[in-house]
UniProtKB/Swiss-Prot annotation:
Gene responsible for this protein: MSH4
Annotated family: Belongs to the DNA mismatch repair MutS family.
Subunit-structure text: Heterooligomer of MSH4 and MSH5.
Binding site for ATP: 634-641
Record region (Disordered): 22-41
Protein name per its UniProtKB record: MutS protein homolog 4
Amino acid sequence: MSESNLSSFISTNYFNLRSAANSSNSISKPSTKKSIRNQKSPTNISSWALKKKTLQIAETTWENNEKDSTHSHYLMTGSMASRTATSLSRYSTNASLLGPSIDCVLCCIYEVPRDISTRIGLCIINCNTGQMYLSDFMDSQIYIRVVHKLQIYQPTEILIPSSSLAPTVSKLATMIKFNVAETVKIEEGSRKCFNSQDGLAAITKYLMDDTKKDLKIEEIIDKTFALCAASAAISYMEEIISKSSRNLNAFRKLRIQFEGTENTMLIDSKTVRGLELVENKLDKNGISLWKFLDTTSTKMGQRSLRNSILQPLTDRGSIEMRLEALEELKANDDLLQKLRLEMKSLPDLDKLFSRLLCINHSAIKPDQRINYVLLLKETLQSVKSLKDALNDQLIQSRLISETKKIFNNDAIMEIEKLINSCINEDCVWASSAIQLLNQRSYAVKSDSNGLLDVSRQIYKEVKEEFFREVEDLTAKNKINLDHNYDSARGFYLRIKRQEFTDDVATLPDVFISRTIKKNYIECTTLNIIKKNARLKEVMEEILLLSEETVDELLDKIATHISELFMIAEAVAILDLVCSFTYNLKENNYTIPIFTNNLLIRDSRHPLLEKVLKNFVPNTISSTKHSSSLQIITGCNMSGKSVYLKQVALICIMAQMGSGIPALYGSFPVFKRLHARVCNDSMELTSSNFGFEMKEMAYFLDDINTETLLILDELGRGSSIADGFCVSLAVTEHLLRTEATVFLSTHFQDIPKIMSKKPAVSHLHMDAVLLNDNSVKMNYQLTQKSVAIENSGIRVVKKIFNPDIIAEAYNIHSLLKIAKARTENEDSNGVVDQKTINQMKRIHNLVAILKECAGNEKEPLTLGKLKEINSDFIENFEE
């Protein structure tokens, strides 16, 4: 199979096997870039706001639910006539309550352009969920971490200091320009807006009051660059809200979190795109690792999965806590199914709870606050079901035990008591306009307000008068009258057309505002119009009195906001590990362990194994002393690129805390991952080679012993002489860094030269020459390099004219003769190489024995020792 068609093949075939529901999870970004406007520096925050389109945050509107009385009016997509009839779903929650599905994210980046160092302060505010993330770090010369953060959070608007744009555009501003979509607005602010003291004051103001508040302030007090970014971001947000408060959520508190760079793996943006971690390169709706692994039940879990893919864990203890949870859930299938089923009923908790952070609950329209309370109550009941499911089990894993502890928090019962003290317990979701009317009228308990009881009695009397009016009109005019209600007209009359066959003009004059519909004739009377006016007045009084009670209730619930967000985070992590466990069982994955060496037995490509029959697994092995740098050679289309991507994807999955597609997996913890994988669809020229080398020169400085580096076709697109020299020099440098490196190359002399080094291993993708001179690919990695002469010519034999193929063979023969004349074989070199290979096998034996001795799950047995010994003796003399 052609490597260039790999992505499209996976996308086409995989979607034939998997439900199309997952296609809704894709995140698409336009490929074109936005140029930075080199505008005059503003003098204050206000001048920014005059130039920019305000952040788009939809208000929670519910009018559309009540416009057409001939249809069911859903507060959620799906009938909710009773709480137990249909569970809530993350896809069914009405977006008008929880806001738009695409988050509005503000990102403020602070730098000092003239400073030699590349220190960065970052502040990201999610305007839908009320979350703020702060970072302060030293970046590389090409700002890999900044671009990484932009890729993770996908901001809709970016703020940078005016000094980054004038008098000259800084390198950071240029990197931002080329790594965001054209829909992202890039704005500037004056230097005085970036003030660390103002930032600290703003954070103190917006930080939620809980037991960890002082610790959080202490954590960020010396992060001056992050505080500068926070100062400008919060000032900008407040300025925009003050100018357009109707369309924006005015948060009184924010969920503030400082994100260090030491606990997550750094994956540069080109690696993210090349490995197709979150988006397919060829088709934005195509398959990616994120979409493939996404079997989550909630929006929170889905976001957590994406973040885990882009930022795998580097803290070994945290990874092993997730793996421990996988072990427990794997052994308890009933619990796994019950938890996944219960979580499917949950709405987006981050967005739901964030509405309580807004000033005066402005994110919830007054006439919809009862609906919000009902959704909150429904959510807490689902959380209690999760709690009951966990309480019924003897939980051993630390991670699930912690979520169980959070679900047993007394705050849940206290919030339920508060709701039940104000809202009638039999109040449920409405499915029609008249039910909505009754719900608003009777949701609040009668003993909450004396005036409310009086208004309700009047409301009841007016409705009874209307019903009597309908009965009188029916009896007087000998017409079978029906009635209905919608929010625009109030009550009105309906006559079935099949029962009234006469002309509409023959109706008595008392019936006015006649409208002919498909099945009904709709009309009203003057008396009904008067009663509707009276009913509207009474309803306004009821709603006003009810709103006062509900507002007080929301204020009391908001005092438990910290506990509610703890619940949201607990659900997210529980959903994530349940998703990992589901994938583990469905895809026959194994749970990895973490040691000092990389050993993956019979590894499989997680996506390709699902669409290719008889996928050939390969064992991956890398130790520091004998094979830290592995050079892969082989024919074109022999599977080198697939193997290299496979290595990277499996390492990412392991550090996410997920199962892996292999029989066994032992991993070191990598803190950086850089991959440059071949894209055969792109034209390869010397200019591509120059760009490749220039880019590589930048991130070579970012490589250390904890880096995993994947290089596909090192030196591709280059001339033979120059490309070979540079590629060999790069390989030599990579060896000195002691990083874990997997690279493939078309320069056959590189492995010949480098394999004499103790830490270098040369592996080959096996292929067989058949009797008809065609080449059969076995896709199997071997240590024996068997070169098939003219393999490239044989692969394209059926494509070109026979005369061209014959000429190619002739040229190859001439080049082979010329090379033989100049080669000076050194027989001692053969002896030296054999000695080196034997030393490598000794190092490998030591590493394997240490691995087996430290593996508590698979104790070292006599039989296993004999197997290792036999394998070592058999291969030692090769």
